């Protein structure tokens, strides 16, 4: 056996060596001397027209350890391009001091794109909006005299040009532009200027012309674009941003290609917003409407939104960004959005020759029905897009002598102008739903300690003025928090005689939230919203005879990210009075105010191990405002994404091992009765196996014992498919632009596949007929077939995948039922079979965990295994891992040199 296993190890070592870094595919998309140009039809790479399916992934919104997987997954989704903004305030936090480390390592991110054989679009801006703090503009710009942002204003143009040229040179030095052999094929100057151009009038046109000329003068060798415009200066290409650019946007310059720089895959959300979704069907419909009319580049904004870590989100914007994108906040594929768009990309690319070079024609087939055709008669190639633009009205049209059924608000692709190979409303791919699981590792030692911030008094503050100061000028974007404090004297006849009558403090604020204290007693909280420019804090409070101290902690949920008046946006107390006194209203606005920017915990970095040691901690208590809480937790096993559930808390900040996870605000309840976001992503890259420091700053009231560390899975998969769907993409292929069937059975089928290490445990729902709803919320219709669930159980239970025919006879359905849509809806619950492996390795043979992982994977027959699922410990020469206690062991012992492998498995799997 030893010889047999030794041979397996040797083979595994060879295979592992081939998998080590450096074995990436050679870059072939561009080379030194590549020419990127354009004509009226498309961008051209070395004179060849091409199609570009792009996805927005912003490098600062995910840790570098996630970038490669995100880009690889995007490529699996049929994309060939990744788009990103460049974040000025992240790269130049102080004038002339640049930062390109960690999540802001732009060059590393572009190299990841290059290593995965994809193009890049870089939107330099440098104003970007992006729901990013201050629209990406550094705060210090506001302190430059006479500056007006994004205008024909010399101070702004000087700083803008300096940064643009700095970024361009940095990209050139790294050989990132296509003519240098790099991935960048397109760059953007400015951003959605049409939104504020009306405020700039003639000066706005001058500014745009200057920006275009300045950008072109940098000589990057690839085209520049200006987005959300119908026309752009000179050779700059205007592009569209929006949901339905095929129907809402007109390109005025007919010598330039139709490019779509932002196809919004959902609606970004702010605290207080309810869930906002955009269906896969609507996105696909919009894309094909745009391509039917000649579009050749679409960029999904966002394809992966990621996380607004720390304080990077704009005013009120959720910490989780575009979670409804094709890849969710954690990088997991959101089905059916991911798969339905992947199929669309593959279909169009299969017929790119007819599409890019064919003669275009247009036909009206009826009210709301259109055909857009692309034909190359000499090559016998024909491609047609049949559109039904009517809402709620399915229909059948006659096109070139044949009848075609086209659902409402959908587009069908006819690959040879007669065979339907894709319809935007007919979804084949499975659906999926997320679930959250509290792990044993994180539930242990759930012991919290706390430290409460001191409430400042007027006489101890250093910045004192007659009236309250503007907030941003004090915090300078280094903190969300500014203390305002004032003191005043009351006599006994000032106070109400009745004890049931309490004075009321009224404060008008243009900040985002406020916490009030009177004589150190908590008074209450107040807040605004994204839609309100100000709010009124109005709370009763207890006052006393003598000196009374008022302290208000004003907070900002990010700086505004757009608008022509961005430099003029203010925050803080605008008016303050006390009502309900016997002597009338007391106006405190001119009473004299003290200010303290930032929290003590921020100043001393309480969220780090070093900073934490400067404070006296005590056992945690519930429902204390302005309090820091801390505990330690171990990293959950496996590689599932990790979140922290903050449902038991109210509002504040989260830190893990010194990293700012972001703002939370679970006390801001939507109209639906729940928080906009209650779980917050903790990237595994921020963690170590044991003893992770979790720090919470709670502004209001909360119960830290209820905070949960959880893992995220997509445990429910679904299919929702009709007999009317066209043949699945897997049943045909393109042969020189001609359609070719590759399967004998082209009937409609629903295919359900489990993720790795999962099997089908339960059929939660199954119905054939006219079911309604969505994955996780299906309901049976009036034509429901009672036998459907038993049939699906027989076909699927215990398996890693199953194929379900979508044929009424299989389920005993009554095809004559008046309301039937011949639709199958199935929801399956998956079982998790996670194999936990622990290895004790003697020295000399194995130097890297990655090789150990590959060896074990090959020995055990699980090549998909990754190092996150393994625990590796190097044994000492005299001490063979004494703390290693596997539950079930399989030993392997070799010599020359010695190596010992001890493998521990759980009960789900055996070697």
Curated annotation (Swiss-Prot):
Similarity comment: Belongs to the glycosyl hydrolase 35 family.
Active site: 192, 262
Keywords associated with the record: Apoplast, Glycoprotein, Glycosidase, Hydrolase, Secreted, Signal
PANTHER family: BETA-GALACTOSIDASE RELATED (PTHR23421)
GO MF annotation terms: beta-galactosidase activity; carbohydrate binding
Signal peptide: 1-25
Cellular component per GO, a single term: apoplast
Localization: Secreted, Extracellular space, Apoplast
Catalytic activity: Hydrolysis of terminal non-reducing beta-D-galactose residues in beta-D-galactosides
GO biological process: galactose catabolic process; plant-type cell wall modification
Cytoplasm as UniProt keyword: no
Record keyword Glycoprotein present: yes
PROSITE patterns: GLYCOSYL_HYDROL_F35 (PS01182), SUEL_LECTIN (PS50228)
UniProt-listed Enzyme Commission number(s): 3.2.1.23
InterPro entries linked: BetaGal_gal-bd (IPR048913), Galactose-bd-like_sf (IPR008979), GHD (IPR041392), Gly_Hdrlase_35_cat (IPR031330), Glyco_hydro_35_CS (IPR019801), Glycoside_Hdrlase_35 (IPR001944), Glycoside_hydrolase_SF (IPR017853), Lectin_gal-bd_dom (IPR000922)
SUEL-type lectin domain segment(s): 744-831
Name listed for the protein in its UniProt record: Beta-galactosidase 12
Residue positions with a glycan: 263, 389, 473, 777
Domain of life per record: Eukaryota
């Amino acid at each position: 056996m030893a010889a047999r296993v030794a041979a397996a190890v040797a083979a595994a070592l060879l295979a592992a060596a081939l998998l080590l870094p450096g074995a990436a595919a050679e870059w072939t998309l561009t080379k030194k001397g590549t020419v990127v140009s354009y004509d009226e039809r498309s961008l051209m790479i070395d004179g060849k027209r091409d199609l570009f399916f792009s996805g927005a992934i912003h490098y600062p919104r995910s840790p570098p350890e996630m970038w490669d997987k995100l880009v690889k997954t995007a490529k699996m989704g049929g994309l060939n391009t990744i788009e990103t903004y460049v974040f000025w305030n992240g790269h130049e936090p102080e004038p002339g001091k640049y930062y390109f480390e960690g999540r802001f390592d732009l060059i590393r991110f572009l190299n990841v794109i290059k290593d995965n054989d994809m193009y890049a679009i870089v939107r330099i801006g440098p104003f970007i909006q992006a729901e990013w703090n201050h629209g990406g503009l550094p705060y210090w710009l506001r302190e430059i005299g006479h500056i007006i942002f994004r205008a024909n204003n010399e101070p702004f143009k000087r700083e803008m040009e300096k940064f643009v040229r700095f970024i361009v040179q940095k990209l050139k030095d790294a050989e990132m532009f296509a003519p240098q052999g790099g991935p960048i094929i397109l760059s953007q100057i400015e951003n959605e200027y049409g939104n504020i151009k009306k405020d700039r009038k003639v000066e706005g046109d001058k500014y745009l012309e200057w920006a275009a000329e300045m950008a072109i003068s940098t000589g990057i060798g690839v085209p520049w674009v200006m987005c959300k415009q119908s026309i752009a200066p000179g050779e700059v290409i205007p592009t569209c941003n929006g949901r339905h650019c095929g129907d809402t946007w007109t390109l005025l310059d007919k010598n330039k290609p139709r490019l779509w720089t932002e196809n919004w895959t959902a609606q970004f959300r702010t605290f207080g917003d309810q869930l906002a979704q955009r269906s896969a069907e609507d996105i696909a419909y919009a894309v094909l409407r745009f391509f039917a009319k000649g579009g050749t580049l679409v960029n999904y904004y966002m394809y992966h939104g990621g996380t607004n870590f720390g304080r990077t989100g704009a005013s009120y914007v959720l910490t989780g960004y575009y979670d409804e994108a094709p890849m969710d906040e954690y990088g997991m594929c959101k089905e059916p959005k991911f798969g339905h768009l992947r199929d669309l990309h593959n279909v169009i690319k299969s017929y790119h020759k007819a599409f890019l070079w064919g003669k275009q024609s247009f036909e009206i087939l009826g009210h709301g029905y259109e055909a857009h055709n692309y034909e190359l008669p000499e090559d016998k190639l024909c491609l047609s897009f049949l559109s039904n633009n009517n809402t709620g009205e399915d229909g059948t049209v006659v096109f070139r002598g044949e009848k075609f059924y086209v659902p409402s608000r959908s587009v069908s692709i006819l690959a040879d102008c007669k065979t339907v190979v894709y319809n935007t409303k007919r979804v084949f791919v499975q659906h999926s739903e997320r679930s959250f699981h509290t792990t044993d590792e994180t539930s242990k030692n759930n012991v919290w300690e706390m430290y409460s911030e001191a409430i400042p008094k007027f006489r101890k503050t250093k910045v004192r003025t007659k009236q309250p100061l503007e907030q941003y000028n004090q915090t300078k974007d280094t903190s969300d928090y500014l203390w305002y404090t004032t003191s005043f004297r009351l006599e006994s006849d000032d106070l109400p005689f009745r004890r049931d009558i309490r004075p009321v403090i009224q404060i008008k604020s243009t900040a985002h939230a406020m916490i009030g204290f009177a004589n150190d007693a908590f008074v209450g909280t107040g807040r605004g919203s994204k839609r309100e420019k100000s709010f009124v804090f109005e709370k009763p409070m207890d006052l006393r005879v003598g000196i009374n101290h008022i302290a208000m902690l004003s907070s900002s949920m990010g700086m505004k990210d757009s608008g022509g008046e961005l430099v003029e946006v203010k925050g803080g107390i605008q008016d303050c009075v006390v009502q309900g006194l016997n002597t009338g209203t007391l106006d405190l606005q001119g009473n004299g105010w003290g200010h303290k920017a930032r929290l003590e915990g921020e100043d001393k970095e309480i969220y780090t191990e070093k900073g934490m040691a400067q404070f006296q901690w005590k056992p945690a208590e519930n429902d204390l405002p302005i309090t820091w809480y801390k505990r330690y937790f171990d990293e959950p096993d496996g590689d599932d994404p990790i979140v922290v559930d903050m449902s038991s808390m109210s509002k504040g900040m989260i830190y893990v091992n010194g990293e700012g996870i972001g703002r939370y605000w679970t006390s801001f309840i939507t109209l639906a009765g729940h928080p906009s976001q209650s779980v917050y992503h903790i990237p595994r890259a921020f963690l170590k196996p044991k003893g992770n420091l979790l720090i919470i700053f709670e502004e209001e009231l909360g119960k830290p014992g209820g905070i949960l560390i959880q893992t995220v899975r997509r445990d429910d998969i679904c299919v929702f498919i009709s007999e009317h769907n066209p043949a699945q993409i897997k049943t045909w292929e393109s042969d020189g632009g001609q359609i070719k069937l590759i399967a004998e059975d082209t009937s409609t089928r629903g295919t359900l596949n489990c993720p790795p290490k999962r099997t089908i445990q339960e059929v939660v729902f199954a119905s054939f007929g006219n079911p309604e709803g969505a994955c996780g919320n299906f309901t049976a219709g009036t034509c429901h077939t009672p036998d459907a669930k038993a049939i699906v159980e027989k076909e699927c239970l215990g398996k890693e995948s199953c194929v379900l025919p979508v044929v009424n006879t299989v389920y005993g359905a009554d095809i004559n039922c008046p309301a039937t849509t011949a639709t199958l809806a199935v929801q399956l619950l998956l079982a998790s079979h996670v194999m936990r492996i622990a290895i004790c390795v003697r020295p000399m043979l194995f130097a890297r965990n990655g090789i150990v992982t590959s060896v074990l994977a090959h020995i055990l027959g699980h090549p998909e295994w990754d190092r996150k699922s393994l625990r590796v410990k190097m044994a000492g020469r005299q001490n063979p891992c004494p703390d290693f206690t596997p539950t079930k062991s399989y030993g392997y012992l070799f010599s020359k040199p010695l190596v010992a492998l001890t493998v521990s498995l759980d009960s789900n799997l055996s070697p």
